């Protein structure tokens, strides 16, 4: 969905978003009730203070002397009521914070759990920065709006109705002056809120786009600098940044008009009460103290309209962000596991029967693929870029489901076994290394958290990683920066290999496993892999054909089909597509 489309949610969609927000609040109904009760106490105390002040004023006016004793009694009452109001306001803040940040926590937890169930196709087609923006920035903005809503909306509405009752009790005509003029604030606020909402929605969307772009630029900064594309990167950022500025200015323009417009109406109300009240006071209809009460109430009555108009604007922004979070939560999950899904007990036998797959409906990638892999065989998959090698690995791991045919492991269709048991049967070394922020020891033990130090050390030695690990500042307790930023690419690859060495699952998938390791290290790693692969079904994906010469079977893929199959010597003797790939690689090395 484009940013423009996102910014045009219909009123029905906004109502649906609000309903879902209320559903998220429902588990915290106890705190909502407490908040309402405490807000009522706080408002009642605040509204009682003007009455006490009016009484004190009347006690100081008149033909006789000032009633100092009476004034002191009133002052003591004012202090007590003010303390009660302050304490109630503090409790209100505690309750509202509990509601807001609990809902925010629940939303983030739900979003992260959702990401765990999303199909790989969703993650491949959505920028990671945008997903992060929804989980972090959008939830934060939503929390700010929700907190303001709870803090000011409850007390504001209670203040409006409370002051209205007190004013009606004191003088109906003056009250009518207030009631007739004040609703103009709501008309103005409603008009501006409708126009600011779509811009806040657009702002949230463009902010997510900007986060994705910044994330991409930071991760690829070395490549950008190597190719001298700094200017192009700045231009791309300036374009997104400019759009964010434009939509933000429009959103702020309409939202910032709300406060002065409502204050203008409030000042008219205050002046009207002062004039009409003065006439009544001169005529003897009310006392000076009562006029003071009305002026205070007029201010307190109109102030919530001003605050609520600001709250409405913030809630519009909060709803816009909530809609983006709910859009993530509503994304279609990966195909659920079968109700009677089995735990896979594999013997290493893998069979593909008439497998077909496509990323796009009109563009088939793999068609009619048949393959029978015996237990313990080493299967090398080679071919030009885009022929389907990595896709085949994704299908074996069930990151994607086949569109036709079936994949069986140990005679079981992988759609009938649990994903956890299927993926736990494979050890993977991917082309793109991934390390978590933690120690070297924790990264090696990622697949086996209960591993002993002896097992971790043995795995590192088997992967030829022990020597470089010991040279690190704190050895195995060295903390690795985000995505391994403080070690080399080759060292990251060695740690990923050690991670697999520790688990030793029955099947292996090696996707360009040694593409970032120097030749000397590669020889050592190949020897370690040879020992590790003994008796284990292994799938090897590589562009460097020299790394798969020892494979039992080489599958040569082209346009989603296996065009040749055999061992290295057989395929070279055929002089076919594999021979051309092999010879062209070494011709390139020689030149």
Feature locations, PLM:
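Cytosolic ends of transmembrane helices, especially the final helix of ABC transmembrane type-1 domains
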Residues: 229, 253, 270, 300-328
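Transmembrane helix-loop-helix hairpins at lipid-water interfaces of multipass membrane proteins
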Residues: 32-88, 168-173, 284-288
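A hydrophobic transmembrane-helix motif
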Residues: 48-50, 54, 81-84, 149-193, ...
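Membrane-integrated ABC transporters
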Residues: 1-46, 61-75, 92-96, 100, ...
